[in-house]
Protein backbone atom coordinates (compact mmCIF):
# COMPACT_ATOMS: atom_id res chain seq x y z
CA UNK A 1 0.00 0.00 0.00
CA UNK A 2 2.76 2.48 0.89
CA UNK A 3 4.50 2.15 -2.51
CA UNK A 4 1.75 3.80 -4.55
CA UNK A 5 0.65 6.52 -2.12
CA UNK A 6 -0.21 9.88 -3.63
CA UNK A 7 1.19 13.01 -2.00
CA UNK A 8 -1.63 15.47 -1.38
CA UNK A 9 -0.57 19.07 -0.80
CA UNK A 10 -3.98 20.64 -1.40
CA UNK A 11 -5.89 22.73 1.11
CA UNK A 12 -7.98 20.80 3.60
CA UNK A 13 -7.39 17.07 4.10
CA UNK A 14 -3.84 15.85 3.71
CA UNK A 15 -1.89 12.63 3.66
CA UNK A 16 -1.88 10.47 6.78
CA UNK A 17 0.71 7.84 7.73
CA UNK A 18 -0.28 4.30 6.72
CA UNK A 19 -0.30 3.02 10.36
CA UNK A 20 -2.83 5.73 11.27
CA UNK A 21 -5.05 4.76 8.34
CA UNK A 22 -4.78 1.06 9.25
CA UNK A 23 -5.82 1.73 12.86
CA UNK A 24 -8.74 3.88 11.67
CA UNK A 25 -9.81 1.13 9.27
CA UNK A 26 -9.76 -1.48 12.05
CA UNK A 27 -11.63 0.80 14.47
CA UNK A 28 -14.21 1.54 11.78
CA UNK A 29 -15.31 -2.09 11.98
CA UNK A 30 -14.70 -2.76 15.67
CA UNK A 31 -13.72 0.23 17.81
CA UNK A 32 -11.25 -0.98 20.46
CA UNK A 33 -12.93 -4.38 20.71
CA UNK A 34 -16.38 -2.92 21.46
CA UNK A 35 -18.02 -4.98 18.71
CA UNK A 36 -19.20 -1.91 16.81
CA UNK A 37 -17.99 1.06 14.83
CA UNK A 38 -17.94 4.55 16.33
CA UNK A 39 -20.48 5.39 13.62
CA UNK A 40 -22.85 2.78 15.08
CA UNK A 41 -22.63 3.46 18.80
CA UNK A 42 -24.93 5.60 20.88
CA UNK A 43 -23.63 8.98 21.95
CA UNK A 44 -24.85 7.97 25.43
CA UNK A 45 -22.78 4.76 25.62
CA UNK A 46 -19.87 4.26 28.01
CA UNK A 47 -17.52 3.63 25.09
CA UNK A 48 -18.46 6.91 23.40
CA UNK A 49 -18.25 8.76 26.73
CA UNK A 50 -14.73 7.37 27.07
CA UNK A 51 -13.82 8.76 23.64
CA UNK A 52 -15.04 12.22 24.64
CA UNK A 53 -13.28 12.16 28.02
CA UNK A 54 -10.00 10.98 26.48
CA UNK A 55 -10.23 13.62 23.74
CA UNK A 56 -10.90 16.38 26.26
CA UNK A 57 -7.99 15.26 28.44
CA UNK A 58 -5.69 15.24 25.41
CA UNK A 59 -6.83 18.72 24.35
CA UNK A 60 -6.31 20.07 27.87
CA UNK A 61 -2.82 18.57 28.03
CA UNK A 62 -1.64 19.58 24.54
CA UNK A 63 -3.19 23.07 24.55
CA UNK A 64 -2.69 23.77 28.29
CA UNK A 65 -6.41 24.44 28.81
CA UNK A 66 -6.98 25.27 32.49
CA UNK A 67 -9.65 23.54 34.58
CA UNK A 68 -11.72 26.72 34.86
CA UNK A 69 -12.39 26.58 31.07
CA UNK A 70 -14.95 24.30 29.43
CA UNK A 71 -14.15 22.27 26.32
CA UNK A 72 -17.14 22.14 24.00
CA UNK A 73 -17.64 19.62 21.21
CA UNK A 74 -20.01 21.24 18.76
CA UNK A 75 -21.25 20.35 15.31
CA UNK A 76 -21.50 22.76 12.43
CA UNK A 77 -18.02 23.48 11.18
CA UNK A 78 -16.94 26.83 9.79
CA UNK A 79 -20.43 28.05 8.90
CA UNK A 80 -21.60 27.71 12.49
CA UNK A 81 -18.50 29.57 13.66
CA UNK A 82 -19.27 32.39 11.22
CA UNK A 83 -22.53 32.93 13.15
CA UNK A 84 -21.00 32.29 16.58
CA UNK A 85 -18.52 35.14 16.17
CA UNK A 86 -21.07 37.99 15.99
CA UNK A 87 -23.41 36.21 18.40
CA UNK A 88 -20.66 36.29 21.03
CA UNK A 89 -18.64 39.41 20.21
CA UNK A 90 -21.17 42.03 19.10
CA UNK A 91 -21.98 44.52 21.84
CA UNK A 92 -23.06 47.66 20.00
CA UNK A 93 -23.97 45.82 16.80
CA UNK A 94 -21.04 47.01 14.64
CA UNK A 95 -18.17 44.97 13.23
CA UNK A 96 -15.66 45.32 10.41
CA UNK A 97 -14.53 42.60 8.01
CA UNK A 98 -11.64 42.32 5.55
CA UNK A 99 -12.98 40.42 2.54
CA UNK A 100 -9.94 38.58 1.22
CA UNK A 101 -11.36 35.24 0.09
CA UNK A 102 -14.10 32.66 0.31
CA UNK A 103 -14.20 32.16 4.09
CA UNK A 104 -14.00 35.87 4.93
CA UNK A 105 -16.81 36.57 2.46
CA UNK A 106 -18.98 33.80 3.91
CA UNK A 107 -18.29 35.04 7.44
CA UNK A 108 -19.27 38.58 6.42
CA UNK A 109 -22.50 37.40 4.79
CA UNK A 110 -23.47 35.41 7.89
CA UNK A 111 -22.57 38.26 10.26
CA UNK A 112 -24.84 40.67 8.35
CA UNK A 113 -27.78 38.82 9.92
CA UNK A 114 -26.73 40.14 13.33
CA UNK A 115 -25.88 43.79 12.90
CA UNK A 116 -24.15 46.58 11.02
CA UNK A 117 -21.27 44.91 9.21
CA UNK A 118 -18.77 47.02 7.29
CA UNK A 119 -16.35 45.82 4.61
CA UNK A 120 -13.16 47.46 5.84
CA UNK A 121 -11.42 46.07 2.76
CA UNK A 122 -12.23 43.87 -0.24
CA UNK A 123 -10.03 42.35 -2.91
CA UNK A 124 -13.00 40.66 -4.61
CA UNK A 125 -12.65 42.78 -7.78
CA UNK A 126 -9.13 41.43 -8.28
CA UNK A 127 -10.15 37.81 -7.56
CA UNK A 128 -8.93 37.98 -3.95
CA UNK A 129 -5.33 38.23 -5.10
CA UNK A 130 -3.98 39.98 -2.00
CA UNK A 131 -4.57 40.91 1.61
CA UNK A 132 -4.61 44.59 2.58
CA UNK A 133 -1.77 46.66 3.85
CA UNK A 134 -2.51 48.51 7.06
CA UNK A 135 -3.10 51.71 5.05
CA UNK A 136 -5.76 50.03 2.89
CA UNK A 137 -7.95 49.15 5.88
CA UNK A 138 -10.98 51.27 6.75
CA UNK A 139 -11.56 50.14 10.33
CA UNK A 140 -14.21 52.02 12.28
CA UNK A 141 -13.09 53.13 15.74
CA UNK A 142 -16.44 52.10 17.24
CA UNK A 143 -16.52 48.57 15.78
CA UNK A 144 -16.85 45.80 18.34
CA UNK A 145 -14.36 43.65 16.46
CA UNK A 146 -12.41 43.36 13.21
CA UNK A 147 -12.52 40.03 11.35
CA UNK A 148 -9.80 38.61 9.12
CA UNK A 149 -9.24 35.17 7.66
CA UNK A 150 -5.49 34.89 8.20
CA UNK A 151 -4.82 32.19 5.60
CA UNK A 152 -6.80 31.97 2.36
CA UNK A 153 -5.92 28.55 1.00
CA UNK A 154 -8.18 28.78 -2.07
CA UNK A 155 -6.49 31.96 -3.32
CA UNK A 156 -3.05 31.39 -1.84
CA UNK A 157 -2.87 34.55 0.24
CA UNK A 158 -2.11 35.10 3.91
CA UNK A 159 -1.49 37.89 6.36
CA UNK A 160 2.15 38.34 7.30
CA UNK A 161 1.22 40.81 10.01
CA UNK A 162 -1.52 41.39 12.57
CA UNK A 163 -3.53 44.48 11.59
CA UNK A 164 -3.61 47.36 14.06
CA UNK A 165 -7.20 47.98 15.14
CA UNK A 166 -6.89 50.48 17.95
CA UNK A 167 -8.65 49.95 21.25
Identify the meaning behind each predicted range.
Residues 4, 68, 92-94, 142-143, ...:
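A general structural motif
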Residues 5-56:
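A glycine-/small-polar-enriched, mobile loop at the entrance of the PLP active site in fold-type I
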Residues 12, 111, 123-167:
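Active-site phosphate-binding strand-loop segment of PLP-dependent enzymes
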Residues 115-122:
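A glycine-rich helix N-cap at a beta->alpha junction
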Residues 90-105:
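Conserved PLP-anchoring active-site segment centered on the Schiff-base-forming lysine
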Residues 17, 81-83, 104-105, 155-156:
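Short, well-ordered alpha-helical microsegments
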Residues 74-76, 97-101, 148-151:
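Short His-Asn-centered micro-motif
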Residues 36-81, 88, 102, 110:
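Conserved N-terminal alpha-helix of the aminotransferase class I/II PLP-enzyme fold
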Amino acid sequence: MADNRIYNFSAGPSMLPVPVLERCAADMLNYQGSGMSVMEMSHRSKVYDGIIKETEATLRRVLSIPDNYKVLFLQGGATTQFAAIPMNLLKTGKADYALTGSFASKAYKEAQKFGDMHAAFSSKETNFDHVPTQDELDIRPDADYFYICANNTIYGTKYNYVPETGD
